[in-house]
């Protein structure tokens, strides 16, 4: 039940409204790399989001 609620919440707002995922995050590609890449692409913010171990670098408008 709790997982179902979490999945529905993530589908509704994709984490924190990060709507464009550009890459898989790894130990060498974390928030400190993801955020500048998103900003360079014209987005306002970026971060590694998702459920472990499948974090994705996603950008926010």
Curated annotation (Swiss-Prot):
InterPro entries assigned to the protein according to its UniProt record, in alphabetical order: Defensin-like_dom
Keyword annotations from UniProtKB, A to Z: Antimicrobial, Disulfide bond, Fungicide, Plant defense
Disulfides per UniProt: 21-59, 25-48, 34-57, 38-58
Any one Gene Ontology BP term: defense response to fungus
A Pfam family it matches: Defensin
Domain of life: Eukaryota
Entry's family note: Belongs to the DEFL family.
Full protein name: Putative defensin-like protein 72
């Amino acid at each position: 039940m709790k997982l179902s609620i979490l999945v529905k919440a993530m589908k509704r707002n994709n984490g924190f409204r990060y709507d464009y995922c550009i890459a898989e995050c790894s130990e060498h590609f974390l928030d400190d790399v993801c955020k500048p890449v998103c900003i360079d692409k014209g987005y306002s913010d970026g971060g590694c989001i998702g459920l472990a171990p499948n974090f994705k670098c996603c950008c926010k408008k």
